[in-house]
């Protein structure tokens, strides 16, 4: 069974934690990770971009001049794309970019991503992330103690002290276990869990 040391916020070892191999030491299926990230990013798209075509732009539908006898190319109306102020030809219209992935595959992708981080030794477990007060400096000192830079923090309980202390720190994101997602796991170079958060994630990702 996979194991990790448990530290306090000053990086003093306070124990060990056994990890569920099915969650943190599973086979890494990169194709599933890629698919899950692609779907999450696609589902973020608003798809509301739109331009006016010749049917929507304001203006008369009257023929600008007669069909024959002027020596000019025939024209249908002033709303045509070749005219200034005319409609756009083949421009973007609202579109639904949403894709779906079944729950079993989503969980498998998250397990693969966490297993990849575990095998890279990029997971840190702490007994608690309670800070005495809201101070960005105190949170930065915790990151410095663990030599962490681009970090995703998963904490078991909503702690305004931690969230407010971390808010102004670049390349750091604080989430609860229910907010754990494939894009953020892959975006950040390391993940810090509290002990309780590890257990909640294991419970949520059981196959």
From Swiss-Prot:
It comes from the Bacteria. GO terms for molecular function: rRNA binding; structural constituent of ribosome. GO terms for cellular component: ribonucleoprotein complex; ribosome. The keyword Ribonucleoprotein applies. The keyword Ribonucleoprotein applies. InterPro entries: Ribosomal_uL4 (IPR002136), Ribosomal_uL4-like (IPR013005), Ribosomal_uL4_dom_sf (IPR023574). Keywords: Ribonucleoprotein, Ribosomal protein, RNA-binding, rRNA-binding. One of its GO terms (biological process) is translation. Residues 62-85 are annotated as: Disordered. HAMAP family: Ribosomal_uL4_B. Belongs to the universal ribosomal protein uL4 family. PANTHER family: 50S RIBOSOMAL PROTEIN L4, LARGE RIBOSOMAL SUBUNIT PROTEIN UL4M. One of the primary rRNA binding proteins, this protein initially binds near the 5'-end of the 23S rRNA. It is important during the early stages of 50S assembly. It makes multiple contacts with different domains of the 23S rRNA in the assembled 50S subunit and ribosome. Forms part of the polypeptide exit tunnel. Part of the 50S ribosomal subunit. This is Large ribosomal subunit protein uL4. The lineage of its organism: Bacteria, Pseudomonadati, Thermodesulfobacteriota, Desulfuromonadia, Geobacterales.
